[in-house]
Amino acid sequence: RTSSRHQDFKDAVAVQFALGDVLLHTHGHNEPFFGMGNRGKVVNIWQWRADWQTEIETKEKIEYATKGMDLDAMIFGGEVNPVDALNPFRDNPVEELNAEGFGTLTPQPRTKQNVLGKGVWKDGHWSVVLYRTLDSLNKWDKQFMNDQPILVAFAIWDGYEQDRNGRKVVSMWQRLHLP
């Protein structure tokens, strides 16, 4: 669950799709690395964050576990952070990103953010739904086509276990078949 205390870590979930024409476990393993892709093998990531949803629903700014000591706060100055005020994603708890390996995670521009979602906390567990139209004109989005398997992987951040950034539970690639 998400709280507004800075010492609490936040819950999140991400779904990752391999871009391009790749198949799981083909000769030569042409699929990207399941941990955020690798050079030349870009992945499309949809991340839902419980803290963003709480901010949207309560209109209350959440403190972070870094207690304002992250790079933005050091560069732009603590509580009054002009970069934070311009954050375009706070009307949606989901952010769409791309990566091609560690250290390359990049949010898509605001005009390309087309994934929506919502999480519901009930009986000590989150249920999260992420969605967008099947087709997309953005070349950095996964193109969903009927009768073609899709490579999908998942990541879960459990704030109670102090998960954050690269500390998370991840799955290997799975095949998803759309009817």
Place the predicted regions along the sequence by residue.
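Mature, soluble, non-transmembrane domains
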Residues: 62, 67, 105-106, 110-114, ...
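Generic hydrophobic/packing signal
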Residues: 16, 111-112, 123-127
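Beta-strand-rich interaction surfaces with strong enrichment in secreted/lumenal proteins
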Residues: 115-121
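Glycine-centered flexibility motif
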Residues: 101-103, 125-127, 131, 147
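A beta-strand/beta-hairpin structural motif
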Residues: 120, 127-136
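Acidic/polar low-complexity flexible segments
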Residues: 2-90, 122, 137-179
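Surface-exposed, low-complexity/disordered Ser/Thr/Gly/Pro/Asn-rich loops and linkers
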Residues: 85-110
